[in-house]
């Protein structure tokens, strides 16, 4: 209860301030690229402060640790593969430049950066385990020769690991000069490979797919662009191979990711 009060004390003033705006004021803000916020959008749909609070908390909590963990894993890999960092940075400087604030359109055009994010989410999905409950009786076919099919009764909990699914070598093309082993970080694989349905599900899928998927990808791409604009080199501090995968709700680097960033010499 004490923690809930801290959260409420933080978000309530923002909600009250927004609800004090008239419909005309909200409509005027909606035409601005710089002043219109998610909170203003919510106020256009409901004037119920509890509903707005719940939506804000969902975004603040679900969009914090997941994004932070993914960016940490990306920096962990980039520090180990300097040539990948240089390639990513070159793309950013070519399409955005060293100083300009990237637009949403810029972020979508940065193919190598988006490939790097996809590759990070493939190896380290933010939520590596999940559960679904069967709505009807069904049977799952066995994938192992000689083993019986699996009966699933309505109401049964089905646990699955997105991390294990996305690292199954039998679901990928054979290793080659153009396709790195499945457990190796390689944004290049996305240049000539597209996963089959349900093979790549870092945001899950179906009616319960993560509603913040595009927001998260945009946020992470923006952060990486700003870092790449300023820093020419990334070095890992510590034993890269000693890293562990810590899993609670979110899967994150158990030892943290300590890196040194070197500014571009102008």
Which ranges hold each PLM region?
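Conserved cytochrome P450 catalytic core segment spanning the I/J/K helices
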Residues: 2-70, 187
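Cytochrome P450 I-helix active-site segment
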Residues: 27-35, 77-127, 134-136, 153-156, ...
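Conserved cytochrome P450 K-helix/beta-meander segment immediately N-terminal to the heme-binding cysteine loop
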Residues: 160-193
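C-terminal helix/juxtamembrane-tail motif
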Residues: 252-266
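Cytochrome P450 heme-binding "Cys pocket" and the immediately downstream C-terminal segment
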Residues: 82-84, 196, 209, 213-252
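Short, small-residue alpha-helix embedded
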Residues: 66-79, 223
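Cytochrome P450
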Residues: 1-10, 46, 61, 105-115, ...
């Amino acid at each position: 209860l004490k923690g809930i009060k801290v959260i409420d004390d933080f978000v309530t003033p923002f909600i009250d301030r927004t609800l004090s705006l008239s419909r005309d004021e909200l409509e005027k803000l909606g035409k601005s690229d710089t002043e219109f916020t998610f909170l203003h959008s919510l106020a256009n749909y409901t004037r119920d402060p509890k509903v707005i609070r719940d939506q804000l908390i969902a975004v603040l909590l679900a969009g914090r640790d997941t994004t932070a963990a993914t960016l940490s894993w990306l920096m962990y890999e980039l520090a180990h593969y300097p040539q990948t960092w240089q390639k990513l940075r070159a793309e950013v400087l070519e399409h955005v430049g060293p100083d300009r604030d990237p637009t949403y359109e810029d972020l979508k055009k940065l193919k190598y950066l988006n490939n790097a994010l996809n590759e990070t989410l493939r190896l380290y999905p933010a939520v590596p385990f999940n559960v679904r409950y069967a709505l009807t009786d069904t049977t799952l076919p066995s994938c192992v020769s000689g083993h019986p099919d699996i009966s699933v009764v309505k109401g049964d909990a089905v646990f699955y690991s997105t991390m294990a699914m996305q690292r199954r070598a039998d679901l990928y093309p054979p290793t080659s000069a153009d396709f790195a082993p499945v457990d190796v970080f390689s944004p290049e694989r996305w240049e000539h490979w597209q996963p089959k349905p349900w093979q790549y599900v870092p945001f899950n899928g179906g009616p319960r797919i993560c509603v913040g998927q595009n927001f998260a990808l945009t946020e992470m791409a923006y952060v990486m662009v700003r870092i790449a604009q300023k820093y020419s080199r990334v070095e890992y501090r510590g034993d890269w191979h000693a890293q562990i995968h810590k899993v609670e709700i979110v899967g994150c680097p158990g030892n943290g990711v300590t890196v040194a960033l070197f500014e571009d010499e102008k």
